[in-house]
From Swiss-Prot:
Upper lineage: Bacteria, Pseudomonadati, Pseudomonadota, Gammaproteobacteria, Alteromonadales
UniProt protein name: Lipid-A-disaccharide synthase
Top-level enzyme category: transferase
Domain of life: Bacteria
Keyword Secreted: no
Natural source organism: Shewanella sp. (strain W3-18-1)
SUPFAM superfamilies: UDP-Glycosyltransferase/glycogen phosphorylase
Disulphide bond pairs: none
Biochemical pathway: Bacterial outer membrane biogenesis; LPS lipid A biosynthesis
GO biological process assignments: lipid A biosynthetic process
Keyword vocabulary terms for this entry: Glycosyltransferase, Lipid A biosynthesis, Lipid biosynthesis, Lipid metabolism, Transferase
InterPro entries attached to this UniProt entry: Glyco_trans_19 (IPR003835)
Amino acid sequence: MSKKSQLVFAMVAGELSGDILGAGLMAALQKSHPDARFVGIGGPRMEALGFESLFAMEELAVMGIVEVLSRLPRLLKVRASLIKDITALKPDCFIGIDAPDFNIGLELKLKARGIKTVHYVSPSVWAWRPKRIFKIAKATHMVLSLLPFEKAFYDKHQVPCTFVGHTLADDIPLRSDKAAARQLLELDADAEYLAILPGSRGGELKQLAEPFVKAALLIKENFPDIRFVTPLVNQKRRDQFEQALKDHAPDLEIHMVEGKSREVMTAADGILLASGTATLEAMLVKRPMVVAYRVSPLTYRIAKSMMQVNRFSLPNLLAGKDVVPELIQDDCTPEKIAAAVTVELNRDFAPLNAEFERLHQMLRCDASQKAADAVMRLVETKEG
């Protein structure tokens, strides 16, 4: 460990889900080291705990291979600046939270400069581009994985990895309170609601807002009394979604909420959502869901050629079988989405609810504390 009396941690979180994980890790580290300093790139939750952001987190919130290329010069400039600043800071440890295409390159440079590095959230090496594990081994002293099957993959390749579970599984109660969520959001206690979550990034809304809005029109035909509620992460995303609504379904009423995505999902009877961490939250609040995703055709062709698995949503990956419908790319049409949502809203939910509860228990491990303990073991380990 550094001889400094104050521990210093450099961290980079790339998006909303990383901010949640980063804040949980910070809080756990602050319990035993209240004067620890945290510097790098973080979001509002991390900043509320005293995190010092050198750049806005939005800089890294880019989706898709093609989409990243247009932002590459700026991303490289940010990374070069971080390498310089973090090297000068000489932190006790660097923790890259998710954002693997950005963070692993950063970790590689920092590790070569003698800084201990941790990657929090395993990249999906088991799903696509499995050879990345060799770069991860070179770039990190340890990986913190959220999902149990990931550790087995790292163990097989003799790469240090600690399974910590998922903070969402710790935070979300085993029994979610629909009535309380509706009261909080001022929604009708007795109406049937479908939550629509088209993603938190601009690129996601660009791809998904139109088919989701058009699907809602078709769903309304099957369920005339159904109501729709959509959480948007900020005003920019709200403006984007409102434009899609105006363009494609001007007469459709959708109740919009800023933030509060978990409360919206809890309040709903069913959920239509983009693939990503939100699918895990939907599973943990135990609601029937339809998962859809679409990227640019070129991004999809490149990604498909590298895929090692046939599933992409977290509930299905965790279960090791198809428990929720997935509609990707050409299947992400209003007609197919509406048909899938109709089936899910009409089905017997009891077997799926039991499966979701089993998966919830599996991920409930006090993740932030386990992650903090693993980081501190590394910090206290002497080099060589």
